[in-house]
Design a protein with these regions (language model features):
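Terminal amphipathic alpha-helical/low-complexity segments used for targeting or macromolecular assembly
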Residues: 1-102
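Structural signal for interior beta-strand "rungs" in well-ordered beta-sheet cores
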Residues: 99, 103-197
Length: 199
């Protein structure tokens, strides 16, 4: 899947110290394409494979490069501004976009670009980081956090205040993985590298 794209990302990451403004500009279309793949669910930082999980390190590399191609900027809405490099996932959404998404997004939710939100998911006021995957029918309850690149399966309940750890570096580190049909209790913290098996 996306072998040419992967090769370009790998090459850019291996030579990241030498990337100048022109090189970063030239790389932006590939990085935006990766973000779109993550948001659509067509690519995942970690995916089930042969009874286990495979980490796609090149997607983590793309996320790290994505940070480099953005300057800090004011975002959000009047009266509630943010100062960040990563755009909000839903900042340009209208009613039709939300209908297509098929998830419920309650006021107070912060989801960053590059996060996947499955059909019939419910996001109470919570935080979903870049590269995270929230499966279909999953509820992320109030003040819960799904960290960068964390993978949450379908029909899960991430209870109020729970933290699902995120990890971008080291690249080979496995993100936190919550498989399908799991209940994570209130105020629980599931840290990087932990896999909670299917419920």
């Amino acid at each position: 899947m996306n072998t040419e794209l992967q090769a370009r990302i790998e090459h850019a990451f291996d030579n990241r110290a030498a990337l100048d403004v022109a090189a970063i500009e030239a790389l932006k279309p590939d990085l935006y394409h990766v973000i779109a793949l993550l948001e659509s669910g067509d690519a995942r930082v970690a995916e089930p494979q042969d009874g286990g999980w495979k980490v796609n390190e090149w997607l983590k590399k793309a996320v790290l490069l994505y940070f480099r191609c953005h300057d800090m900027d004011v975002m959000g809405e009047p009266g509630n501004p943010f100062w960040d490099k990563v755009p909000l996932r839903f900042e340009n959404y209208d009613a039709e976009d939300f209908r297509r998404l098929g998830a419920r997004v309650v006021p107070g939710t912060v989801a960053r670009a590059g996060s996947y939100i499955g059909k019939d998911a419910v996001l109470m006021p919570s935080f979903i980081n870049i590269g995270a995957h929230v499966g279909a029918g999953t509820m992320v309850d109030t003040w819960a956090t799904v960290g960068s690149c964390a993978q949450v399966g379908a029909r899960c309940h991430i209870s109020g205040g729970a933290g699902i750890g995120g990890v971008l570096e080291p690249l080979q580190a496995s993100p936190t993985i919550i498989e399908d049909n799991c209940f994570i209790g209130a105020r629980s913290e599931v840290v990087e590298g932990v896999i909670v098996g299917e419920g």
